[in-house]
């Protein structure tokens, strides 16, 4: 059995889950996640109903939890750095059974061959799906001839503390690139943040 210890924000948890589970399935191993999370001190927004972790949002994933690592397990720790030649670790693909895997494993290359499975694993609760579908229909009815571009402004505590905030020039240049590539198409930008809030100003 391969056990994945999840850590940090929800996006990191999702990548680790999808990547490590895909590795385990590809090798014919059982897969579980550890009930204990790492580094939960820098949290973004927390939904009143669903919280901010994989196991609080996805009921089926919560069923894959174990509370402790059995004796005799090896530990594999991801070692991707800015100087790494690839975003995929060959060592991660070669782990043996009975291993605890630590890290984020942020690369779709680990699971692109299982994309349909990943979409099923992360199927949202029905009430979220219903609310989303209503919003999308409303937008399509209001802008029937437009293309939609979703923009995620990373501005939460973890980004500010670690110095990862991007300047306004980055976002303006990105928006200009989208508009330049779709000159004949009306583009509607859908803006959202790491925290639930309204857009208060545009720069």
Where does each model-flagged region fall?
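Histidine-anchored nucleotide/phosphate-binding helix
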Residues: 13-25, 171-180
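A short, glycine/small-residue-rich beta-strand->loop->alpha-helix junction that serves as a flexible
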Residues: 6-15, 160-166
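Short, flexible loop/turn elements at secondary-structure junctions
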Residues: 8-9, 37, 155-157, 193-195
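A short beta-strand-loop structural module common to alpha/beta enzyme folds
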Residues: 27-40
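Donor-binding and catalytic core of enzymes assembling or modifying cell-surface/extracellular glycoconjugates
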Residues: 10, 183-203
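Short beta-strand segments
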Residues: 33-35, 150-152, 188-193
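Extreme N-terminal starter segment of soluble prokaryotic enzymes
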Residues: 1-3
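Secretory-pathway luminal glycosyltransferase catalytic domains
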Residues: 40-186
